[in-house]
Amino acid sequence: MKSLLADLFKQTLPNEEEFDAITIGLASPDKIRSWSYGEVKKPETINYRTFKPERDGLFCAKIFGPVKDYECLCGKYKRLKHRGVICEKCGVEVTLSKVRRERMGHIELASPVAHIWFLKSLPSRLGMVLDMTLRDIERVLYFEAFVVVEPGMTPLNRAQLLTEDDYLAKVEEYGDDFDAVMGAEGIRELLRTLDVNQEIERLRSDLETTGSEAKIKKFSKRLKVLEAFQQSGIKPEWMILEVLPVLPPDLRPLVPLDGGRFATSDLNDLYRRVINRNNRLKRLLELKAPDIIVRNEKRMLQESVDSLLDNGRRGKAMTGANKRPLKSLADMIKGKGGRFRQNLLGKRVDYSGRSVITVGPQLKLHQCGLPKLMALELFKPFIFNKLELMGLATTIKQAKKMVESQEPVVWDILEDVIREHPVMLNRAPTLHRLGIQAFEPVLIEGKAIQLHPLVCVAFNADFDGDQMAVHVPLSLEAQMEARTLMLASNNVLSPANGDPIIVPSQDIVLGLYYATREGVNVPGEGMLFTDVGEVKRAYESGQISLHARVTVRLKEFDRGPEGERIERVVRHNTTAGRAILSEILPAGLPFSVIDKPLKKKEISKLINASFRRCGLRATVIFADQLMQYGYRLATRAGISIAVKDMLVPDLKEDLIRAAEAEVKEIAQQYTSGLVTDGERYNKVVDIWGRCGDQVAKAMMEQLGQEPVVDRNGNTVKQEAFNSIYMMADSGARGSAAQIRQLAGMRGLMAKPDGSIIETPITTNFREGLNVLQYFISTHGARKGLADTALKTANSGYLTRRLVDVTQDLVVIEDDCGTREGFNMKALIEGGEVVEPLRERILGRVCAEDVVNPDTQETAIEAGTLLDEDMVDLIESLGVDEVKVRTPLTCETRYGLCAKCYGRDLGRGAMVNAGEAVGVIAAQSIGEPGTQLTMRTFHVGGAASRAAAASGVEAKSSGTIRFAGNMRYVANAKGEKVVIARSAEVVVADDMGRERERHKLPYGAMLLVDDGAQVKAGAQLASWDPHTRPIVTEYSGTVKFENVEEGVTVAKQIDEVTGLSTLVVIDSKRRSSSGAAKGVRPQVKLLDENGEEVRIAGTDHAVAITFQVGSLITVKDGQQVSVGDILARIPQESAKTRDITGGLPRVAELFEARSPKDAGLLAEYTGTVSFGKDTKGKQRLVITEPDGTVHEFLIPKDKHLMVHDGQVVNKGELIVDGPADPHDILRLQGINELARYIIDEVQDVYRLQGVKINDKHIEVIVRQMLRRVVITDPGDTKFIREEQVERSEVLDENDRIEAEGKLPAQYENVLLGITKASLSTDSFISAASFQETTRVLTEAAIMGKRDELRGLKENVIVGRLIPAGTGLAYHRSRRSQSAGEDLGIEHAWAPIETPAEEQHDISAS
């Protein structure tokens, strides 16, 4: 009825939905009064007897409107006919009661009050404008000091503070020549008399003249705030409130409970306090009360307004009757439960339901089983409509009755209604876009939703009690989108890496694996069959086994040039199971793809091949059939787990005995003093680690093979049909590591702190653990559980930050026309190709022509999307690196172009305009976050540590090349000792392509020559993994300097062995004499004449410094030759392998935190020398080729990677330590930085076996780089050192250059994802992310305008998002508002327009 009336009496309202931007600002007192419908004078709320609102109170009907629709308070006017009448008795306007949700009131404050947000939200805006400290302003506001507002002719300064006594003395002295005030009045006066323009002029000239960095920072901050006031037209004195707006009463309701009590919003309490104090203050002022009383009342008023706006921001929070702090206006909007995140970004939806899920193996991929009762409830309105249409019910009421009594005809209609009406299923947590998919419902009995087994991977669902929610898309458009974009059968590929996500798992894999295995001498071996049908009949009748090797004629279908099917019959020698499986193979795939035991990886490849060759439809049908077949065979196979399947290897005892003997020997060595305790521990851990691996290997060999007698009566080994082995081998369930604990030995365990306990658990679960062993293993298991809980929360928070930083990145045009790109080559690490070139460039667009290295002809033109065929071509050509387009160098402003992004991984084709690639990138990185560890979570806590490598060998045959800056010296024995810090050795194949690359540590022995031919398996270099040597490059006699026992070195006497070594001690631990603090123990070398040996080509003496912890191995006066070891630095004992691993490492990279103890990079290219040392620091000098000299001070305990006379390049590591991403960006540029972040992030994910496309990380890095710092503003509106959006600078520079003026110069700056999200141009998006108060305060002062470009802002204002189908809507809306009436079909036009026109369209 209400809505009907509203329609009848519709005034011609302007269409309020149409707006282009939202601005936020400060409200002037007049503005507040103009919003108000009356002043609230009394603190009363409701009359407790009549329940009617009190007049002039907080719920007054006269101010805020009637309580009941079209009825005044006293009841004189009722009904519609009096609309708009104002009752002369009670003063209430007769209208809809919902105006009580929008009409505001106000309170006239008896004394002005400072707004706490602008006072206390750091940095204090009031303080910045007035150039006073927060402490001073507070002293004035809370009546502890006077402030001089108008010095007059006196020597006092404006804004000077005077205490009470000062003030009285000055009044004595000057009388009323000057004006000083206390409280907010004083501050308001100062703000009112501040001349913003003049202040800006002064600051600008100060900025020009000053030289100090701190002052520049301070001035430019102040300048920014003042300019914001100047531009937005906001007056500074509005930060002081004279009128307080009152929220409409229905937004702070008062609800009567039974028993005469009321439930009320905290705001009412807060307002009541303000009104009480305000009224009391008014009365005191009228009575001319003593100053001290008035002051106290004013201070209390200030405090009550403070807590109304932001309770608890200053002093103690006001509490209600129940001692909990009251919820103020600021608390209403911030945090997870606040307005933004609770109500605007997360709403509950109608037409939805949830239930437990069960498995539905009989469903097709695009179907789900929906319980009848649920469907009935969800589709109710549709059923009512149908009943009326068919004339079975005349009224809605009648239809409702029919549905509720569930008459038979209702079920028929329900069937009809849901036909072809997709529903959306969602499983929380929705970590990526595949967490919501659409299905066609199939009505089923029972109360559980049935889910297709193949989509479980995408939903991460299992059937142990998971629940899922169902949503019904109502409008035709919504149904269409659900069907075309979200239907499960249209989402075969994972958007994170482009691999199929609809892959069989668990039982299906086991069934397929079993069906395609081969057995020796099983019934039917060697038979011949005419076709598959015959094989099937023979199998069904029990004549042959599935695993029998048979010869059979199979039909294969080739795809013709026109896509027609060409049939050919081929004889295959294969197994019966594979032959039967070949029936469901889609046309176009050769039989060879299934002619092997199908393990999980193989099946994934199979589906991928099918998708690329046969298209989506065939693949979906194929996957469904694979599933049916797999389930059927898994059932028939009857594979189960039995205790006797866990075969403990016979070799185990011997292996353990051998290891124990080795450990004993090490202990001997330790007692005789050959190794230190740390080395002994390391070696013991290594021995046990190796022993565990050997036991596991023996176990897998025994499990994986079994002896059988073949047809000729010989005993042969065949792959075992052991249930446990089959499960692990097929990838259905379990892994080698888990079987190892069942039947091998559990191995080493970690202590709570991550260090490894050196006594391993030598038994396994099959044999059983004793008490001590059980106790050792409990720790790891518990830690695993605790970790999981922490991990989920952390991973979710990372995802949230990632989404927030990228949410506004959408593909908006076809091609930005850039020539820039990224040189991609195969990723080689530790000698292995971790990621081949094909995987890195697949689905990208090449930025330059790809040239055939042999003929120098162009093989692939620039701008081509590299699909599978192209990549094959590149591989066959032997091209080493390809330059591809990347989101990092895309020149589109406020978005990305399709060419720079490349293929949409989830669809397998070029990305469409409107694709929200930012959010997809964030989801792809965040979704596997829960699989990452918080630290290192091992299988049941068993320590997995890379046994320290002691050398490298070639994995493939080829030619040796030395890379990096390889330098080595030959020692007395003729061994080559590496003395370069970043030496690498490369093995190249015959075509000169790099096949593997190994880093060599300083001090390694090189065993090959440059250019030598090596065979696979040849040893290239070796070194001691547990110590790092200090090697001399010159020969001579050792002369110690500053090597004094008890001062710089300590004699360590091993308790066990009684042998002594000299150890360099930390300067902090040296004896207190000041002189000894700064000296460094070092070695100089003397030649035969007793002269100091000089560095070749310079007059610097060779001085080799020992760093802290070195064990000095030479004696004073000893003769040394080139390549000899002077000292050893013991490496850290083996902690379980990780530095910061897992999730924290990913977060650290994306937050762009500078690592502690970061390595130092060379700022310039030049020659290194050392200057005079200062206390605790060493002075490093770099001399550029043109003679410019730069000095750096480096703490002495840092390990230098360079030596006197070495030439370094800009960006090279000088001081050892992890790299600082900010330095990389500054010294080596965007590409190097991106490469660093991508490699580091990928390392973490790769360790967990998670595949993520580099593209996604690049998208995030692009967003981290979206701000720049202005170094020289030129003629633009920017200020030096100001941080601005890159696109804004480019727009402004274009404008300025068009006028022929000087553009601004800027440099890139890297922001962490949290910082980047908060510094986005959109204040709505930033406020809904974090630090709501700070963001809104800043935005209000700047008078910011939100252009509503991103997705989040549009969700918040309740619009379609500018992505996907919404992009077209927004485009047409924009162009209409620009005055052209474009139809929707033109809305896509801008995608083809050249780049320069593009900006006008987005700008409009």
Swiss-Prot record:
GO terms for cellular component: DNA-directed RNA polymerase complex. InterPro entries: DNA-dir_RpoC_beta_prime, DNA-dir_RpoC_beta_prime_bact, RNA_pol_asu, RNA_pol_N, RNA_pol_Rpb1_1, RNA_pol_Rpb1_3, RNA_pol_Rpb1_3_sf, RNA_pol_Rpb1_4. Gene3D superfamilies: 1.10.132.30, 1.10.150.390, 1.10.1790.20, 1.10.40.90, 2.40.40.20, 2.40.50.100, RNA polymerase II, clamp domain, RNA polymerase Rpb1, domain 3. One of its GO terms (biological process) is DNA-templated transcription. Keywords: DNA-directed RNA polymerase, Magnesium, Metal-binding, Nucleotidyltransferase, Transcription, Transferase, Zinc. One of its GO terms (molecular function) is DNA-directed RNA polymerase activity. It comes from the Bacteria. Zn(2+) 1 binds at residues 72, 74, 87, 90. Binds 1 Mg(2+) ion per subunit. Binds 2 Zn(2+) ions per subunit. Mg(2+) binds at residues 462, 464, 466. NCBIfam families: rpoC_TIGR. DNA-dependent RNA polymerase catalyzes the transcription of DNA into RNA using the four ribonucleoside triphosphates as substrates. This is DNA-directed RNA polymerase subunit beta'. The lineage of its organism: Bacteria, Pseudomonadati, Pseudomonadota, Betaproteobacteria, Rhodocyclales.
